[in-house]
């Protein structure tokens, strides 16, 4: 059976990223891959979580009062799916995401979205540090060309690949959409790499699909069940009013 505790996390798949001011982007088919995965999750009744960035930058197209803050229609939420709004790069900082995953006993995440090197990377790193098993889908994420401190411009594809390389094996397992879907089609395939264990009790079982054969992430010590979470970061600001769960 498909593991019930594996959630699809769609990070910042918002209309504002179509703004030409972002510049040249890689992976033009990323949203199509996201839509494929979203449909697969829905078909199997697996949990889906949408993350929406509400920027406080007055020049950002992702400001909550602008049309660009809206989630893209092709991957938008259904009424029963959870939407969590954030104001910083990590989807975990001062949002109800971790508490929701705790309540639902979700121990593994499949992460897709925008952009690879900013909110996707930050969310993946924090999820790994919190003890979740994380899978990042390489062709369902994307980024933009960026300038370095020395004035050199780096291509979106180079930035994308470097971030995938730095995340894989340390914070997550990176794999393609086709490999992930092949694993789902296996029916009993666990979304767990060899040698890893679920964050909490779950129904994952051994298997041998492409997912199971891939090198798994190495995590730090897990937080013990029942242990109080760390207090909110003093750097941040209270985003609780901006986090919501749909019915």
Tell where the protein language model's regions lie, with residue ranges:
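N-terminal nucleotide-binding beta1-loop-alpha1 segment
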Residues: 8-13
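Short, glycine-rich nucleotide/cofactor-binding loops
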Residues: 21-28, 112-116
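Short catalytic helix/loop segments, enriched in acidic residues and glycine
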Residues: 25-39
């Amino acid at each position: 059976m498909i593991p019930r505790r594996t959630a699809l996390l769609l990070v910042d798949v918002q209309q504002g990223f179509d703004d030409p001011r972002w510049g040249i982007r890689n992976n033009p088919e990323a949203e199509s891959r996201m839509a494929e995965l979203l449909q697969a999750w829905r078909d199997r009744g697996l949990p889906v979580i949408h993350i929406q960035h509400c920027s406080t930058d007055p020049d950002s197209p992702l400001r909550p009062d602008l049309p660009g803050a809206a989630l893209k229609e092709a991957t938008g939420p259904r009424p029963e799916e959870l939407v969590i709004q954030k104001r910083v790069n990590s989807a975990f900082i001062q949002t109800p995401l971790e508490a929701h995953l705790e309540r639902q006993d979700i121990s593994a995440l499949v992460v897709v979205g925008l952009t690879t090197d900013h909110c996707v990377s930050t969310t993946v790193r924090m999820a790994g540090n919190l003890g979740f098993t994380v899978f990042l889908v390489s062709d369902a994420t994307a980024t933009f060309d960026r300038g370095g401190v020395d004035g050199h411009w780096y291509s979106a594809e180079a930035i994308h690949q470097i971030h995938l390389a730095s995340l894989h094996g340390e914070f997550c397992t990176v794999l393609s959409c086709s490999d992930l879907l092949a694993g789902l089609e296996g029916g009993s395939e666990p979304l767990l790499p060899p040698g890893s264990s679920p964050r909490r009790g779950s129904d994952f079982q051994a298997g041998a699909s492409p997912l199971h054969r891939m090198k798994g992430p190495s995590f730090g010590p897990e937080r013990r069940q029942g242990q109080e979470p760390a207090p909110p970061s003093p750097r941040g600001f209270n985003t609780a009013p901006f986090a919501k769960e749909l019915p």
